[in-house]
Design a protein with these regions (language model features):
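Function-dense linear segments that define catalytic or interfacial modules
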Residues: 161-213
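Long, basic N-terminal domains or extensions that often function
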Residues: 1-158, 163-167
C-alpha cells in the first residue's frame, strides 16, 4: 500500500484524454470534473493527493441512486452496493450479458451480426446496466449501399446492424440502452433517430449519383 500511495498521483497525471476540461478555479485538466477519488487496497483506504483532491474511502453517489457521500470499506461492498442499484461494475459481465442477449435474439430471428470487437467494447464502456433492444428501419433504405448504412449505424449511433444468412444487410439493428424498455419508448426513439440519419444518407447518395466523376 505504501508503494501505491507513493506512485498513484504520478500515475494519474499520465492519463491522457482526447478531450479534456478545466473547471472552477482548479488547474487540473481531465475528461470530466473530478469530485472525489475512492481508493482502497486490502480493505484499507489509500491516502494520496492528486491535484486538489485527497483520496479516501468515500465517493459521491449519483443523485438518481442515493444523495451525498458513500463510504466503502472494501471492493466487494462497492460491487454489491451498485449491483443492488442495477449497475454492473464488472465490464466483462456487462459484455457477457450484451453478447448473450444478442445471440438469443439473432438465433430466434435467424440473423447474424458482424464481429466488431471494437464497437462492442465501446458500447460496454458507455452503459452501466445494459438492456439489448432490437429495432428496425424502413426497408426502402436498403436501396442505399450497405456500406453507407453500416457506417451510419455503427459510427454515428453505436448501433449493431444485422445480416441474413447470405450476409445481406437487413433492416433490423441492435441498440444497447441503459434503460429497460418496458413501454417501447426507447425502441421508438432510436427508430426515429435512425430514420432521420438514413434519410440524410439517402439524400446525399442520390445527390452524388447525379455528379459525374
Amino acid at each position: 500500500s505504501d508503494l501505491l500511495e507513493k506512485n498513484l498521483s504520478e500515475i494519474l497525471t499520465k492519463i491522457t484524454w482526447k478531450k479534456s476540461m478545466k473547471w472552477a478555479n482548479y488547474d487540473l485538466y481531465w475528461g470530466r470534473p473530478l469530485k472525489s477519488i475512492l481508493a482502497i487496497f486490502n480493505k484499507k483506504p489509500l491516502n494520496f493527493v492528486f491535484n486538489h483532491i485527497n483520496s479516501s474511502n468515500k465517493t459521491f453517489i449519483d443523485k438518481s441512486l442515493e444523495e451525498g457521500l458513500k463510504i466503502f470499506n472494501n471492493f466487494n461492498s462497492y460491487i454489491k452496493f451498485f449491483k443492488q442499484k442495477g449497475i454492473l461494475i464488472d465490464q466483462d459481465l456487462r459484455k457477457k450479458i450484451i453478447q448473450n442477449k444478442i445471440n438469443e435474439i439473432i438465433n430466434k430471428k435467424n440473423l447474424k451480426i458482424e464481429q466488431n470487437d471494437r464497437l462492442i467494447d465501446e458500447i460496454v464502456n458507455i452503459v452501466e446496466k445494459p438492456a439489448v433492444i432490437i429495432c428496425d428501419f424502413d426497408k426502402k433504405f436498403l436501396n442505399v449501399p450497405s456500406e453507407i448504412l453500416i457506417t451510419t449505424m455503427q459510427s454515428h449511433q453505436k448501433y449493431l446492424p444485422t445480416f441474413d444468412k447470405k450476409n445481406n444487410l437487413t433492416n433490423n439493428f441492435f441498440v444497447v440502452s441503459d434503460i429497460k424498455d418496458t413501454k417501447g419508448f426507447v425502441k421508438l426513439g432510436n427508430e426515429r433517430v435512425i430514420e432521420a440519419r438514413l434519410s440524410d444518407a439517402e439524400f446525399f447518395w442520390e445527390k452524388n449519383k447525379t455528379q459525374n466523376l
